[in-house]
Amino acid sequence: MDPIIEQLRGKVIASCQAYMGEPLRHPETMAQMARACELGGAGGIRCQGLSDIAAIKGRTEVPVIGIWKEGHEGVYITPTLRHARACVMAGADIVAIDATDRPRPDGNTLEDTVRPLKEEGVLVMADCSTIEDIRHAFAIGCDIASTTLSHPGAAIDCGMADGPDVALVRQAVEEFPDKPVICEGRVHTPADAKAAMDAGAWAVVVGTAITHPTSITSWFVEAAGK
């Protein structure tokens, strides 16, 4: 097992991302957020955009999982080989890519993207939607599979009561006991994180519940108003 991946075992990975038009959308702000998460015990950081990757890599000592989002529909998480290579150049230790079977914007297959990355020694995290995605990702050489895309819509559109896809984590771990399966998506409480780890997750990614104050505030406002 690669030592960087081994370093993530049993850890919480903080996803530090701000969306277009939000007050926190600035590389230095995200770097400060990432450093704060590291001080709290985060064992890794997931972040979006070349400037954010570079800034966070310069401020933290834990592994950085980089993505480059292009748009908001279809395959938009690191959708092409060009995007993936740019994330590596920006400093990402691991590159996460959409690993669903949807058409990719450059017309290539997922394997067309993963193969050259692996030849170049890049660690690849497959953002999956189904167990079939996970099977395919491991079959073509992806190093990590995650449940990132097993839920519809953006994470910030989920309510606090929406939980992670623990069933998919459990199924993937049962089929691939020696492979790193990471739980990501709708991990909103410490109990959610524990449930994912109890299901066998290699690590758990937590984003909105740690690093998106607008959503966190709205949860309190909604609860207080009832």
Regions found by a protein language model. Name each.
Residues 17-19, 90-104, 144-158, 199-220:
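Glycine-rich phosphate-binding active-site loops on the catalytic face of alpha/beta enzymes
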Residues 1-89, 132, 136-140, 225:
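Conserved N-terminal beta1-alpha1 strand-loop-helix module at the mouth
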Residues 19-24, 71-77, 101-106, 132-136, ...:
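Short, small-residue-enriched loops and turns at beta-alpha junctions
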Residues 42-49, 76, 93-106, 123-135, ...:
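Catalytic beta/alpha-barrel core
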Residues 1, 19, 23-24, 165-226:
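Alpha/beta catalytic cores of nucleotide-metabolism and tRNA/nucleoside-modifying enzymes
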Residues 41, 59-64, 90-94, 119-121, ...:
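Glycine-enriched alpha-helix->loop->beta-strand junction motifs that scaffold or abut catalytic
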Residues 83, 110-115, 119, 130-131, ...:
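Short loop-to-alpha-helix "cap/lid" segments that border enzyme active sites
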